[in-house]
């Protein structure tokens, strides 16, 4: 069967899309997924006119134009209870490149087209199966490299952040409904405590959202914490980078000033991604290249979440940053002062203690409330916009101005989830009041 023998779809009907759901690397099985109105006709054409039972694994011989393409498992997934909300199917194929290419050719010939990046999830959002926050979480889940990233992405995909923002939006709707009543029915002589209650609720919302903005756990989990190793030349910074990471990423010599530019690599500690940065030795110098390396080192120190400040046996302690952990190095030559952590990268002494201290510091940075944290700059910008309009609403002298600022705050929250709905506001207004009946 070819495309010409399939029933025509209306011009405004989304086209069937397909894509390989598994990776391109060599494997036993490859999963081809498809979605869109008309998926049933395409699957029937491939399965010799027999559509598999919904959501039941079926072994089928796939054919096109009389040619056997593969012996595969077919899954028919009718909407709306599918990932995209549309009719769709999966083909679990043998993963040979020739088979995958031939199946793709057949799907194209039958009227489907290759999906654009993220198009399956985009359709899920458009069909209301996911909101924007959940869609972003799916991307984060696919990209997750650490246990903390996996847990956070899964929590957001399950709707934790969406529920928080929806709760704020619902409370704003109720405030706005009362505010509209004050504007539209001024002769009803509503008690003064009604307006006072509106201001109090706005203050609570503003406090909660402002606290949410201060919580940067989500961004730290997604991007990783920055741990900068700093100190004077030849104090053991590169040796510590290699010891912690278990690599030879940095060149180690007895010559001072070997590291001219920052060397960075990723390291996972307790399921949290850390960005370890080895920096140029800090000292006075006339060398322009070394001076630039030192300038960059100081920049990294200022930006760091944690600074491992290494101090040699003959040095005094000078504080570099409020985030630093002072560490005496080369304790195989001279012991560390009482109360100060000492390490030797030669013998390994003190490295376990350093990992424990660093683990505790990471736990402190990741500690916070039970509320889900924001995870992207888009979320931060949206919440900041909502807070700004709340502040304007709280201090507005005219009821109409307050109402407009509340609408703008709701709009900012709605853009975060993708749920911007005027009808929901009307439902809140007419559902809460019986004035005028």
From Swiss-Prot:
- Cite the record's note on assembly: Homodimer. Heterotetramer of two MnmE and two MnmG subunits.
The protein's UniProt keywords, in alphabetical order, are: Cytoplasm, GTP-binding, Hydrolase, Magnesium, Metal-binding, Nucleotide-binding, Potassium, tRNA processing
Q: Which residues bind Mg(2+)?
A: 238, 259
Q: From its record, what is one biological process in GO terms?
A: tRNA wobble uridine modification
Q: What is its EC number?
A: 3.6.-.-
Q: Name one Pfam family in it.
A: TrmE_N
This protein's gene is called: mnmE
- Function of the protein: Exhibits a very high intrinsic GTPase hydrolysis rate. Involved in the addition of a carboxymethylaminomethyl (cmnm) group at the wobble position (U34) of certain tRNAs, forming tRNA-cmnm(5)s(2)U34.
TrmE-type G domain: which residues? 224-363
**PROSITE patterns tied to this protein:** G_TRME (PS51709)
Q: What class of enzyme is it?
A: hydrolase
HAMAP family according to UniProt: GTPase_MnmE
Q: Which NCBIfam families match?
A: PRK05291.1-3, small_GTP
Output the superkingdom of the source species: Bacteria
UniProt name for this protein: tRNA modification GTPase MnmE
Q: Which residues bind GTP?
A: 234-239, 253-259, 278-281
Species annotation: Gluconobacter oxydans (strain 621H) (Gluconobacter suboxydans)
Q: How is the cofactor bound?
A: Binds 1 potassium ion per subunit.
Report the subcellular localization. Answer: Cytoplasm
For the ligand ((6S)-5-formyl-5,6,7,8-tetrahydrofolate), the binding residues are 33, 90, 129, 437
